[in-house]
Amino acid sequence: MAKLTVKDVDLKGKKVLVRVDFNVPLKDGVITNDNRITAALPTIKYIIEQGGRAILFSHLGRVKEEADKAGKSLAPVAADLAAKLGQDVVFPGVTRGAELEAAINALEDGQVLLVENTRYEDVDGKKESKNDPELGKYWASLGDGIFVNDAFGTAHRAHASNVGISANVEKAVAGFLLENEIAYIQEAVETPERPFVAILGGSKVSDKIGVIENLLEKADNVLIGGGMTYTFYKAQGIEIGNSLVEEDKLDVAKALLEKANGKLILPVDSKEANAFAGYTEVRDTEGEAVSEGFLGLDIGPKSIAKFDEALTGAKTVVWNGPMGVFENPDFQAGTIGVMDAIVKQPGVKSIIGGGDSAAAAINLGRADKFSWISTGGGASMELLEGKVLPGLAALTEK
């Protein structure tokens, strides 16, 4: 990566501004999944071990009006982070003003401060989300000229707390998490060890058009599963029963199949049910066609075997999107089968592109078997599309 990283700058005695991604799920004020906090620890620990004073910025959820602030405070995150670091985390509970400035100026080397939810600034004219220049300049003024971006999850957005601060500091550098995310995903797509197989699932073709187009050029094979299978089926005139379909994307699906030259591998059977919820019958289809009055909710056993074969010998695998409705035990065999086929390949570099696939790997007990699980759904999708991420582009060149 041709950008400066946190290891390239002198941090001792400096007030170091850090964009982290602490956008964690909360239920009744309790954090239900703290993976993103854990993922940021190496960078935070490195800064304080080097004698820096870490000033952390993060958003949490969406805040559009004053009433939205309730339940969106980073206070529970500050407490969780303090427990993980084994030291106090200063939390003034504001995003600007004299109280925040005084708390920052009182910091000593090795201390950590967390600014309140950056999206509180969205209540008045969406200043954070629209990258208000004055806000970026103000936040930049709170530090000593060094900004560390470690929030891969928002790297595809140009906000005041990433791009805005970057534009107003002497050095904007990547943290360890951001560096790893870029290294794993970009290298997998741009300079993969071959055979390189991509697996794309999820419900909508529309979400993945750019990704499929880019990966058809880069990968040796692209396997398709999940709900978007049925849009590809219908585009070929295959019966899909009541399965999910994007009627307005049939031409796109047809064009992708024609362009693919056999690289696009579709399922050959499905697990079908007579309703999405409250079904009374679940069965495997004979072939591709889904029965009348039924809908496909997972790939079937023949497809699992076919995908297993397509993955044999793969050296690089990128997976984004489950094969079926994996939250339901009746429809998780496809996702489990594909995960197991990936991780059993000897010497494979296996990467999960965030979102539902990451949740599936974690919930189904396979997370530790993958080389890398991305922390950013949207950002990893844009990298897989070959797009330039604004948060990354704003960093200082080496």
Swiss-Prot record:
Any Gene Ontology CC annotation: cytosol
Binding site for substrate: 21-23, 36, 59-62, 119, 157
EC numbers: 2.7.2.3
Binding site for ATP: 208, 296, 327, 354-357
Source domain of life: Bacteria
Functional pathway: Carbohydrate degradation; glycolysis; pyruvate from D-glyceraldehyde 3-phosphate: step 2/5
Record key words, sorted: ATP-binding, Cytoplasm, Glycolysis, Kinase, Nucleotide-binding, Transferase
Keyword Cytoplasm included in the entry's annotation: yes
InterPro entries the UniProt entry points to: Phosphoglycerate_kinase, Phosphoglycerate_kinase_CS, Phosphoglycerate_kinase_N, Phosphoglycerate_kinase_sf
PANTHER family tied to this protein: PHOSPHOGLYCERATE KINASE, PHOSPHOGLYCERATE KINASE 1, CHLOROPLASTIC-RELATED
Single GO term (MF): phosphoglycerate kinase activity
Location of the protein in the cell: Cytoplasm
Similarity annotation: Belongs to the phosphoglycerate kinase family.
Catalytic activity: (2R)-3-phosphoglycerate + ATP = (2R)-3-phospho-glyceroyl phosphate + ADP
Record lineage: Bacteria, Bacillati, Bacillota, Bacilli, Lactobacillales
Coiled-coil regions listed in the entry: none
Name assigned to this protein: Phosphoglycerate kinase
GO BP annotations, alphabetical order: gluconeogenesis; glycolytic process
Complex formation: Monomer.
Keyword Iron: no
